[in-house]
């Protein structure tokens, strides 16, 4: 049995005990993951995760903070707004992956007070968005930051996001298209994501599928169903569009909603 499987079998009390102890950093790491996976609302769990954002004991060989990363990820899934300010502070972490996880969780929490700190990570624009020296990633988690700004509704960041449409990395361009559609509702941004479904690289087609699902772009339904990618991902994308559409139609199933359901049925 793997460590993940063992952790999954924990009870709430075991997970809380494991994150509170200090001798075994591995157990603390898995406990943070456990709280996020099971969306635990227990106040002890929330407080332990908030404390874990400042942990100094669990360090990776490259100087990173594994426990902080998992804590930041989990706090977004719990939906507790008490995490907003600590996550904003985590955007200044020296660990790229902590910053990335914090941005993703702030997107989930959707609190507008995170906007200035997220915008700050776009400082320098595309010219500054280069590979970190000796690392496999860029200097900032631009994809996560741009997506968060779009989801939160940071219209003040439109001018800062637009230049990223020309970034050399496709996923960052897609993030910019996604955010700009969310912030402007201009169809040409979503249509460019639809065009990306015809790209040569499967990984990029997958990204475009998820982005179209995230923005709820109904006209993309047919293109998503026909895309060369796993049916499971196409279903996730269509489900996202349907859920967004139902929110806009006050849960009324109209012709567009029925078509989306039919497309989903065709993929099962």
UniProtKB/Swiss-Prot annotation:
Tell me the keywords, alphabetical order: Antenna complex, Lyase, Phycobilisome
Q: Name one GO cellular component term.
A: phycobilisome
A GO molecular function term, named singly, is: lyase activity
SUPFAM superfamilies annotated for this entry? ARM repeat
UniProt keyword Methyltransferase present: no
Q: Which Gene3D superfamilies match?
A: Leucine-rich Repeat Variant
Q: What does this protein do?
A: Required for the chromophorylation of the cpcA gene product.
- Family statement: Belongs to the CpcE/RpcE/PecE family.
Protein name as it appears in the record = Phycocyanobilin lyase subunit alpha
Which species is this UniProt entry from? Picosynechococcus sp. (strain ATCC 27264 / PCC 7002 / PR-6)
């Amino acid at each position: 049995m793997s460590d993940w499987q063992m952790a999954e079998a924990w009870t709430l009390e075991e997970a809380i005990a494991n994150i509170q102890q200090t001798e075994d950093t591995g157990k603390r790491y898995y406990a943070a993951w456990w709280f996020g996976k099971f969306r635990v609302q227990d106040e002890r769990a929330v407080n332990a995760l908030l404390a874990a954002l400042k942990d100094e004991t669990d360090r990776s060989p490259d100087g990173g903070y594994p426990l902080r990363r998992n804590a930041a990820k989990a706090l977004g899934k719990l939906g507790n707004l008490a995490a907003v300010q600590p996550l904003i502070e985590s955007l200044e972490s020296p660990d790229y992956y902590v910053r990335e996880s914090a941005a993703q969780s702030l997107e989930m929490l959707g609190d507008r007070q995170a906007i200035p700190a997220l915008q700050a990570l776009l400082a320098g624009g595309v010219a500054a968005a280069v590979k970190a020296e000796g690392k496999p990633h860029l200097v900032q988690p631009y994809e996560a930051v741009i997506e968060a700004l779009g989801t939160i509704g940071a219209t003040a960041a439109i001018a800062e996001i637009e230049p990223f449409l020309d970034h050399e990395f496709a996923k960052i361009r897609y993030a910019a298209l996604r955010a700009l559609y969310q912030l402007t509702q201009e169809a040409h941004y979503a249509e460019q994501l639809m065009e990306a479904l015809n790209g040569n690289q499967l990984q990029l087609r997958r990204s475009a599928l998820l982005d179209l699902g995230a923005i709820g772009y109904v006209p993309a339904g047919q293109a998503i169903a026909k895309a060369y990618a796993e049916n499971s991902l196409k279903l996730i994308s269509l489900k996202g569009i349907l859920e967004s559409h139902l929110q806009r139609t006050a849960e009324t199933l109209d012709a567009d909603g029925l078509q989306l359901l039919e497309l989903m049925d065709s993929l099962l």
